[in-house]
Protein backbone atom coordinates (compact mmCIF):
# COMPACT_ATOMS: atom_id res chain seq x y z
CA UNK A 1 0.00 0.00 0.00
CA UNK A 2 2.85 2.33 0.87
CA UNK A 3 4.44 1.60 -2.52
CA UNK A 4 1.17 2.42 -4.31
CA UNK A 5 0.91 5.73 -2.44
CA UNK A 6 4.43 6.64 -3.45
CA UNK A 7 3.64 5.88 -7.07
CA UNK A 8 0.55 8.09 -6.94
CA UNK A 9 2.60 10.93 -5.47
CA UNK A 10 5.18 10.56 -8.19
CA UNK A 11 2.55 10.53 -10.96
CA UNK A 12 2.28 14.30 -10.64
CA UNK A 13 5.90 14.69 -11.76
CA UNK A 14 7.00 14.32 -15.37
CA UNK A 15 5.67 15.31 -18.75
CA UNK A 16 6.32 12.34 -21.04
CA UNK A 17 3.40 10.16 -22.10
CA UNK A 18 3.42 6.36 -22.30
CA UNK A 19 4.23 6.36 -26.01
CA UNK A 20 6.92 9.04 -25.77
CA UNK A 21 8.58 7.08 -22.97
CA UNK A 22 8.37 3.94 -25.12
CA UNK A 23 10.17 5.71 -27.96
CA UNK A 24 12.86 7.03 -25.61
CA UNK A 25 13.36 3.60 -24.03
CA UNK A 26 13.45 1.86 -27.41
CA UNK A 27 15.94 4.42 -28.63
CA UNK A 28 18.15 3.79 -25.58
CA UNK A 29 17.96 -0.02 -25.81
CA UNK A 30 18.20 -0.36 -29.57
CA UNK A 31 20.69 1.26 -31.89
CA UNK A 32 24.33 0.55 -32.62
CA UNK A 33 24.30 -2.72 -30.69
CA UNK A 34 22.18 -4.19 -33.47
CA UNK A 35 25.09 -3.73 -35.91
CA UNK A 36 27.50 -5.78 -33.78
CA UNK A 37 25.30 -8.79 -32.95
CA UNK A 38 26.13 -10.66 -36.20
CA UNK A 39 29.82 -10.26 -35.32
CA UNK A 40 29.06 -11.46 -31.78
CA UNK A 41 27.36 -14.55 -33.18
CA UNK A 42 30.27 -15.14 -35.56
CA UNK A 43 32.68 -15.02 -32.61
CA UNK A 44 30.66 -17.33 -30.37
CA UNK A 45 28.82 -19.65 -32.75
CA UNK A 46 25.15 -20.54 -33.00
CA UNK A 47 24.82 -21.73 -29.42
CA UNK A 48 25.89 -18.29 -28.17
CA UNK A 49 22.41 -17.06 -29.13
CA UNK A 50 21.23 -18.67 -25.91
CA UNK A 51 23.49 -16.22 -24.06
CA UNK A 52 21.81 -13.30 -25.83
CA UNK A 53 18.40 -14.51 -24.68
CA UNK A 54 19.69 -15.16 -21.15
CA UNK A 55 21.11 -11.63 -20.97
CA UNK A 56 17.84 -10.19 -22.28
CA UNK A 57 15.85 -11.88 -19.50
CA UNK A 58 18.44 -10.93 -16.88
CA UNK A 59 18.60 -7.29 -18.00
CA UNK A 60 14.79 -7.03 -18.02
CA UNK A 61 14.64 -8.42 -14.50
CA UNK A 62 17.28 -5.99 -13.22
CA UNK A 63 15.43 -3.10 -14.88
CA UNK A 64 12.42 -4.05 -12.74
CA UNK A 65 14.70 -4.03 -9.69
CA UNK A 66 15.68 -0.45 -10.52
CA UNK A 67 12.00 0.52 -10.64
CA UNK A 68 11.40 -1.11 -7.25
CA UNK A 69 14.36 0.73 -5.77
CA UNK A 70 12.99 4.05 -7.03
CA UNK A 71 9.59 3.29 -5.53
CA UNK A 72 11.23 2.65 -2.16
CA UNK A 73 12.01 6.36 -1.79
CA UNK A 74 10.14 9.10 -3.63
CA UNK A 75 13.25 11.31 -3.48
CA UNK A 76 15.15 8.98 -5.81
CA UNK A 77 15.35 10.52 -9.28
CA UNK A 78 18.55 9.15 -10.81
CA UNK A 79 20.68 6.02 -10.83
CA UNK A 80 23.29 7.51 -8.42
CA UNK A 81 20.41 8.27 -6.02
CA UNK A 82 19.73 4.52 -5.89
CA UNK A 83 23.39 3.87 -5.05
CA UNK A 84 23.27 6.44 -2.25
CA UNK A 85 20.01 5.04 -0.85
CA UNK A 86 21.63 1.62 -0.70
CA UNK A 87 25.23 2.30 0.36
CA UNK A 88 25.41 5.96 1.33
CA UNK A 89 27.85 8.43 -0.20
CA UNK A 90 30.32 5.72 -1.37
CA UNK A 91 27.47 4.01 -3.21
CA UNK A 92 26.60 7.21 -5.06
CA UNK A 93 30.21 7.72 -6.11
CA UNK A 94 30.68 4.13 -7.34
CA UNK A 95 27.42 4.10 -9.30
CA UNK A 96 28.17 7.53 -10.77
CA UNK A 97 31.64 6.54 -11.95
CA UNK A 98 30.51 3.35 -13.70
CA UNK A 99 27.33 4.89 -15.09
CA UNK A 100 28.86 8.03 -16.55
CA UNK A 101 31.92 6.22 -17.88
CA UNK A 102 29.66 3.77 -19.70
CA UNK A 103 27.52 6.51 -21.21
CA UNK A 104 30.61 8.45 -22.23
CA UNK A 105 32.29 5.50 -23.96
CA UNK A 106 29.06 4.40 -25.65
CA UNK A 107 28.59 7.84 -27.15
CA UNK A 108 32.25 7.79 -28.18
CA UNK A 109 31.47 4.52 -29.96
CA UNK A 110 28.78 6.37 -31.92
CA UNK A 111 31.44 8.57 -33.47
CA UNK A 112 33.68 5.60 -34.30
CA UNK A 113 30.75 3.90 -36.02
CA UNK A 114 29.98 7.02 -38.04
CA UNK A 115 33.60 7.42 -39.06
CA UNK A 116 33.94 3.77 -40.13
CA UNK A 117 30.81 3.73 -42.28
CA UNK A 118 31.23 7.13 -43.90
CA UNK A 119 34.87 6.39 -44.68
CA UNK A 120 33.75 3.14 -46.29
CA UNK A 121 31.39 5.13 -48.54
CA UNK A 122 33.68 8.09 -49.26
CA UNK A 123 37.32 7.01 -48.72
CA UNK A 124 38.82 10.20 -50.19
CA UNK A 125 37.09 12.71 -47.90
CA UNK A 126 39.32 15.29 -46.15
CA UNK A 127 38.85 18.50 -44.13
CA UNK A 128 41.28 21.42 -43.93
CA UNK A 129 40.62 24.02 -41.22
CA UNK A 130 42.84 26.59 -39.46
CA UNK A 131 45.94 24.81 -40.70
CA UNK A 132 44.71 21.38 -39.56
CA UNK A 133 44.15 18.57 -42.05
CA UNK A 134 41.85 15.66 -41.16
CA UNK A 135 41.68 12.61 -43.40
CA UNK A 136 39.23 9.73 -43.71
CA UNK A 137 37.68 8.55 -40.44
CA UNK A 138 39.03 11.52 -38.48
CA UNK A 139 37.35 13.98 -40.82
CA UNK A 140 34.02 12.18 -40.64
CA UNK A 141 34.09 11.92 -36.85
CA UNK A 142 34.60 15.68 -36.57
CA UNK A 143 31.86 16.37 -39.13
CA UNK A 144 29.34 14.10 -37.38
CA UNK A 145 30.13 15.69 -34.01
CA UNK A 146 29.29 19.08 -35.52
CA UNK A 147 25.96 17.72 -36.82
CA UNK A 148 25.06 16.12 -33.48
CA UNK A 149 25.88 19.19 -31.39
CA UNK A 150 22.52 21.05 -31.77
CA UNK A 151 20.59 18.02 -30.41
CA UNK A 152 22.57 18.31 -27.17
CA UNK A 153 21.10 21.69 -26.38
CA UNK A 154 17.64 20.26 -25.58
CA UNK A 155 17.29 19.07 -21.98
CA UNK A 156 13.59 18.16 -22.17
CA UNK A 157 13.03 14.41 -22.69
CA UNK A 158 9.52 15.05 -24.00
CA UNK A 159 11.10 17.03 -26.84
CA UNK A 160 13.84 14.43 -27.31
CA UNK A 161 11.19 11.74 -27.82
CA UNK A 162 10.56 13.17 -31.30
CA UNK A 163 14.26 12.74 -32.07
CA UNK A 164 14.03 9.22 -30.62
CA UNK A 165 11.29 8.33 -33.11
CA UNK A 166 13.78 8.83 -35.93
CA UNK A 167 16.28 6.56 -34.17
CA UNK A 168 13.74 3.76 -33.72
CA UNK A 169 12.65 4.13 -37.34
CA UNK A 170 16.28 4.05 -38.50
CA UNK A 171 16.90 0.77 -36.65
CA UNK A 172 13.81 -0.78 -38.24
CA UNK A 173 14.78 0.37 -41.73
CA UNK A 174 18.34 -0.93 -41.27
CA UNK A 175 17.07 -4.38 -40.31
CA UNK A 176 14.68 -4.39 -43.28
CA UNK A 177 17.38 -3.24 -45.71
CA UNK A 178 19.84 -5.93 -44.65
CA UNK A 179 17.11 -8.56 -44.96
CA UNK A 180 16.46 -7.30 -48.50
CA UNK A 181 20.17 -7.43 -49.38
CA UNK A 182 20.39 -11.04 -48.28
CA UNK A 183 17.20 -12.11 -50.03
CA UNK A 184 17.27 -10.16 -53.31
CA UNK A 185 20.73 -8.64 -53.94
CA UNK A 186 22.71 -11.80 -54.55
CA UNK A 187 24.22 -12.33 -51.10
CA UNK A 188 21.88 -15.08 -49.91
CA UNK A 189 21.72 -16.89 -46.57
CA UNK A 190 24.03 -19.79 -47.34
CA UNK A 191 26.72 -19.62 -44.65
CA UNK A 192 26.47 -22.48 -42.17
CA UNK A 193 28.72 -21.09 -39.47
CA UNK A 194 30.00 -22.92 -36.38
CA UNK A 195 27.86 -24.48 -33.70
CA UNK A 196 30.10 -23.06 -30.99
CA UNK A 197 33.47 -21.31 -30.82
CA UNK A 198 34.67 -21.50 -27.23
CA UNK A 199 37.50 -18.99 -27.64
CA UNK A 200 35.05 -16.36 -28.89
CA UNK A 201 32.42 -16.81 -26.17
CA UNK A 202 33.80 -14.09 -23.82
CA UNK A 203 33.80 -11.50 -26.63
CA UNK A 204 30.32 -12.56 -27.77
CA UNK A 205 28.99 -12.32 -24.22
CA UNK A 206 30.55 -8.89 -23.71
CA UNK A 207 29.02 -7.55 -26.93
CA UNK A 208 25.62 -9.04 -26.07
CA UNK A 209 25.84 -7.32 -22.68
CA UNK A 210 26.60 -4.05 -24.45
CA UNK A 211 23.25 -4.36 -26.27
CA UNK A 212 21.41 -4.20 -22.93
CA UNK A 213 23.45 -1.48 -21.26
CA UNK A 214 20.79 1.25 -21.13
CA UNK A 215 20.02 0.92 -17.40
CA UNK A 216 21.67 4.24 -16.43
CA UNK A 217 19.07 6.05 -18.54
CA UNK A 218 16.06 4.19 -17.10
CA UNK A 219 15.69 6.26 -13.88
CA UNK A 220 15.74 9.43 -15.98
CA UNK A 221 13.00 8.02 -18.22
CA UNK A 222 11.02 6.88 -15.20
CA UNK A 223 11.22 10.31 -13.56
CA UNK A 224 10.13 12.01 -16.80
CA UNK A 225 7.03 9.81 -17.25
CA UNK A 226 3.57 11.03 -16.30
CA UNK A 227 1.96 7.67 -15.42
CA UNK A 228 4.75 5.89 -13.62
CA UNK A 229 2.65 2.84 -12.79
CA UNK A 230 2.86 1.98 -16.51
CA UNK A 231 6.66 2.02 -16.64
CA UNK A 232 6.99 -1.75 -16.20
CA UNK A 233 4.80 -2.18 -19.28
CA UNK A 234 7.11 0.17 -21.17
CA UNK A 235 10.08 -1.98 -20.16
CA UNK A 236 8.38 -5.23 -21.17
CA UNK A 237 7.41 -3.92 -24.61
CA UNK A 238 10.85 -2.44 -25.26
CA UNK A 239 12.84 -5.48 -24.15
CA UNK A 240 10.70 -7.84 -26.24
CA UNK A 241 10.93 -5.69 -29.37
CA UNK A 242 14.67 -5.09 -28.99
CA UNK A 243 15.42 -8.76 -28.36
CA UNK A 244 13.46 -9.75 -31.48
CA UNK A 245 15.44 -7.17 -33.45
CA UNK A 246 18.81 -8.25 -32.06
CA UNK A 247 18.13 -11.94 -32.63
CA UNK A 248 16.87 -11.37 -36.17
CA UNK A 249 19.86 -9.25 -37.14
CA UNK A 250 22.32 -11.72 -35.60
CA UNK A 251 20.86 -14.68 -37.48
CA UNK A 252 20.51 -12.84 -40.81
CA UNK A 253 24.01 -11.37 -40.69
CA UNK A 254 25.68 -14.64 -39.72
CA UNK A 255 23.83 -16.56 -42.44
CA UNK A 256 24.94 -13.93 -44.97
CA UNK A 257 28.63 -13.59 -44.11
CA UNK A 258 29.55 -16.39 -41.70
CA UNK A 259 33.03 -16.16 -40.20
CA UNK A 260 33.82 -13.15 -42.42
CA UNK A 261 31.34 -10.95 -40.53
CA UNK A 262 32.96 -7.65 -39.47
CA UNK A 263 32.47 -5.73 -36.22
CA UNK A 264 29.69 -3.72 -37.91
CA UNK A 265 27.51 -5.63 -40.36
CA UNK A 266 27.25 -2.51 -42.54
CA UNK A 267 30.98 -2.77 -43.32
CA UNK A 268 30.29 -6.12 -45.06
CA UNK A 269 27.63 -4.70 -47.38
CA UNK A 270 28.37 -4.11 -51.10
CA UNK A 271 28.39 -0.31 -51.22
CA UNK A 272 27.39 -0.15 -54.91
CA UNK A 273 23.93 -1.56 -54.11
CA UNK A 274 21.10 0.90 -53.44
CA UNK A 275 19.77 -1.23 -50.60
CA UNK A 276 23.21 -1.19 -48.96
CA UNK A 277 23.32 2.60 -49.14
CA UNK A 278 19.86 2.76 -47.56
CA UNK A 279 21.04 0.52 -44.70
CA UNK A 280 24.23 2.51 -44.15
CA UNK A 281 22.62 5.94 -44.35
CA UNK A 282 19.82 5.00 -41.97
CA UNK A 283 22.40 3.52 -39.61
CA UNK A 284 24.05 6.91 -39.51
CA UNK A 285 20.83 8.44 -38.13
CA UNK A 286 21.09 6.46 -34.88
CA UNK A 287 24.02 8.31 -33.30
CA UNK A 288 22.36 11.64 -34.06
CA UNK A 289 19.12 10.41 -32.48
CA UNK A 290 20.71 8.73 -29.45
CA UNK A 291 23.62 10.94 -28.42
CA UNK A 292 21.57 13.56 -26.57
CA UNK A 293 19.41 10.97 -24.79
CA UNK A 294 22.41 8.96 -23.60
CA UNK A 295 24.45 11.94 -22.39
CA UNK A 296 21.58 13.74 -20.58
CA UNK A 297 22.03 11.95 -17.19
CA UNK A 298 25.74 12.83 -17.14
CA UNK A 299 25.10 16.45 -18.09
CA UNK A 300 22.40 16.76 -15.40
CA UNK A 301 24.75 15.34 -12.77
CA UNK A 302 27.48 17.85 -13.60
CA UNK A 303 24.93 20.70 -13.59
CA UNK A 304 23.95 19.71 -10.04
CA UNK A 305 27.52 20.40 -8.90
CA UNK A 306 26.97 24.10 -9.54
CA UNK A 307 25.02 26.50 -7.27
CA UNK A 308 21.28 26.51 -7.98
CA UNK A 309 21.40 29.99 -9.47
CA UNK A 310 23.65 28.61 -12.24
CA UNK A 311 22.44 25.01 -12.64
CA UNK A 312 19.17 26.06 -14.29
CA UNK A 313 20.85 28.30 -16.84
CA UNK A 314 20.59 27.14 -20.46
CA UNK A 315 24.13 28.23 -21.26
CA UNK A 316 25.55 25.84 -18.63
CA UNK A 317 23.78 22.89 -20.27
CA UNK A 318 25.13 24.05 -23.62
CA UNK A 319 28.72 24.38 -22.39
CA UNK A 320 28.81 21.00 -20.64
CA UNK A 321 27.23 19.18 -23.60
CA UNK A 322 29.63 20.80 -26.05
CA UNK A 323 32.63 19.83 -23.92
CA UNK A 324 31.46 16.22 -23.87
CA UNK A 325 31.17 15.83 -27.61
CA UNK A 326 34.52 17.52 -28.26
CA UNK A 327 36.28 15.21 -25.80
CA UNK A 328 34.46 12.22 -27.35
CA UNK A 329 35.93 13.13 -30.73
CA UNK A 330 39.44 13.16 -29.24
CA UNK A 331 39.01 9.69 -27.69
CA UNK A 332 37.37 8.26 -30.83
CA UNK A 333 40.21 9.43 -33.04
CA UNK A 334 42.80 8.06 -30.63
CA UNK A 335 41.21 4.59 -30.24
CA UNK A 336 39.08 3.99 -33.37
CA UNK A 337 38.45 0.26 -32.70
CA UNK A 338 34.67 -0.16 -32.61
CA UNK A 339 34.41 -3.90 -31.92
CA UNK A 340 37.07 -3.96 -29.21
CA UNK A 341 35.83 -0.74 -27.61
CA UNK A 342 32.24 -1.98 -27.39
CA UNK A 343 33.43 -5.33 -26.07
CA UNK A 344 35.28 -3.47 -23.30
CA UNK A 345 32.22 -1.35 -22.53
CA UNK A 346 30.03 -4.45 -22.42
CA UNK A 347 32.30 -6.47 -20.14
CA UNK A 348 33.53 -3.80 -17.75
CA UNK A 349 30.67 -1.31 -17.66
CA UNK A 350 27.40 -2.68 -19.09
CA UNK A 351 27.60 -5.86 -17.01
CA UNK A 352 28.32 -3.76 -13.92
CA UNK A 353 25.62 -1.09 -14.32
CA UNK A 354 22.95 -3.36 -15.82
CA UNK A 355 23.34 -6.51 -13.70
CA UNK A 356 25.75 -6.23 -10.77
CA UNK A 357 24.77 -2.84 -9.30
CA UNK A 358 20.96 -3.26 -9.59
CA UNK A 359 21.22 -6.61 -7.76
CA UNK A 360 23.45 -5.26 -4.99
CA UNK A 361 21.38 -2.10 -4.50
CA UNK A 362 18.12 -4.05 -4.39
CA UNK A 363 19.51 -6.55 -1.87
CA UNK A 364 20.71 -3.73 0.39
CA UNK A 365 17.67 -1.44 0.15
CA UNK A 366 15.14 -4.19 0.84
CA UNK A 367 17.32 -6.20 3.22
CA UNK A 368 16.91 -9.41 1.23
CA UNK A 369 20.53 -10.39 1.84
CA UNK A 370 19.59 -11.08 5.48
CA UNK A 371 17.17 -13.88 4.60
CA UNK A 372 17.74 -16.91 2.43
CA UNK A 373 15.13 -17.51 -0.26
CA UNK A 374 14.81 -18.32 -3.95
CA UNK A 375 15.06 -14.65 -4.97
CA UNK A 376 18.11 -14.03 -2.78
CA UNK A 377 19.92 -17.11 -4.11
CA UNK A 378 19.11 -16.07 -7.68
CA UNK A 379 20.37 -12.53 -7.08
CA UNK A 380 23.63 -13.72 -5.55
CA UNK A 381 24.04 -16.08 -8.51
CA UNK A 382 23.62 -13.12 -10.87
CA UNK A 383 26.20 -11.16 -8.88
CA UNK A 384 28.76 -13.98 -9.17
CA UNK A 385 28.01 -14.42 -12.89
CA UNK A 386 28.40 -10.70 -13.62
CA UNK A 387 31.75 -10.52 -11.79
CA UNK A 388 33.06 -13.54 -13.71
CA UNK A 389 31.92 -12.20 -17.09
CA UNK A 390 33.25 -8.74 -16.29
CA UNK A 391 36.75 -9.91 -15.32
CA UNK A 392 37.25 -12.34 -18.22
CA UNK A 393 35.65 -10.08 -20.84
CA UNK A 394 37.58 -6.99 -19.72
CA UNK A 395 40.90 -8.84 -19.87
CA UNK A 396 40.26 -10.08 -23.42
CA UNK A 397 38.99 -6.68 -24.64
CA UNK A 398 42.01 -4.84 -23.22
CA UNK A 399 44.34 -7.43 -24.72
CA UNK A 400 42.77 -6.91 -28.15
CA UNK A 401 42.90 -3.10 -27.89
CA UNK A 402 46.54 -3.06 -26.79
CA UNK A 403 47.40 -5.46 -29.60
CA UNK A 404 45.80 -3.11 -32.16
CA UNK A 405 47.39 0.16 -31.03
From Swiss-Prot:
Location(s) in or outside the cell: Membrane
List keywords of the entry alphabetically. Amino-acid transport, Membrane, Transmembrane, Transmembrane helix, Transport
Protein's UniProt keywords contain Transport: yes
Membrane topology term reads: Multi-pass membrane protein
- The protein's name: Amino acid transporter AVT1I
Protein species of origin: Arabidopsis thaliana (Mouse-ear cress)
| Family indicated by similarity | Belongs to the amino acid/polyamine transporter 2 family. Amino acid/auxin permease (AAAP) (TC 2.A.18.5) subfamily.
> Could you tell me the Gene Ontology terms of the biological process aspect for this record?
amino acid transport
Q: Which cellular component appears as one GO term in the record?
A: organelle membrane
Name of a matching Pfam family: Aa_trans
The residues that cross the membrane are: 22-42, 46-66, 93-113, 140-160, 169-189, 201-221, 234-254, 278-298, 318-338, 343-363, 377-397
Amino acid sequence: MEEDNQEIQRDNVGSSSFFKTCFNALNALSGIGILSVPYSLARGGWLSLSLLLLLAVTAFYTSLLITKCMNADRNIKTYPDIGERAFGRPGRIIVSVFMHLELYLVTTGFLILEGDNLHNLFPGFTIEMIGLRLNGKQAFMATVAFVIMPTLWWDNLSVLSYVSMSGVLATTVTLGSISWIGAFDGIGFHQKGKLINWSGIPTALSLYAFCYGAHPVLPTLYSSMKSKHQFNNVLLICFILCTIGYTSMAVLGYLMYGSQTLSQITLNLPIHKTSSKVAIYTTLVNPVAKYALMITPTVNTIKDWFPSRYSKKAYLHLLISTFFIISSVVIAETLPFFGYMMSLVGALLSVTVSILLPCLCYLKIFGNYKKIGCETIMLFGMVVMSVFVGVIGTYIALRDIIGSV
